[in-house]
């Protein structure tokens, strides 16, 4: 949201802070790094780079300390993170939105598709960042994550509201581009003239 409001430094600080809270935010940080590099925002690129290096050092120190305390038999589960959960797992992560959590899963699937359409049609710097973030997390969660990791959707599900709001305009643009919207309006106008006796 900070990037959408033109507050790049705040967005950078929030992204790096999120990374220190949860390593899953690394994907967002890499996306921001790539987008800022493509737009030649070198100060932001430097900020992302320094933040990710600081996190890598922090994580290495953490792993070295924890590694000496944890026995190899103390694993939480035997299966790996690569689960290929596909659309089912992705839709379950999309439900981690205050509105979608209480609705049936099929409705979450419809909202997810509409939100992706809205994100794809949002042609602005903020829209680009949102669309790439959604695409990256959805692609990742289609192959990575245990069924009990549904809560990972909290990373991206709040963004679905913004993209869903844009879906109405995106559907309108698609209808206009297809010519169907013009044909439908012409047909309705013709019916109105026939009914009016003109």
Where are these regions (language model features)?
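Membrane-interface alpha helices of multi-pass inner-membrane proteins
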Residues: 1-2, 8-36
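Hydrophobic membrane-targeting alpha-helices
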Residues: 2, 29, 33, 57, ...
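Transmembrane helix irregularities
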Residues: 3-6, 17-24, 57, 61, ...
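Membrane-interface junctions at the ends of membrane-embedded or membrane-associated helices
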Residues: 4-13, 36-44, 164-198
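Membrane-embedded alpha-helical segments of multi-pass membrane proteins
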Residues: 21-26, 107-111, 156-163
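Membrane-lumen/periplasm interface segments of specific transmembrane helices
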Residues: 30-116, 127-134
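Transmembrane-helix signature of polytopic, lipid-linked glycan biosynthesis machinery
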Residues: 134-151
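Hydrophobic/aromatic-rich transmembrane helices and adjacent perimembrane loops
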Residues: 149-169
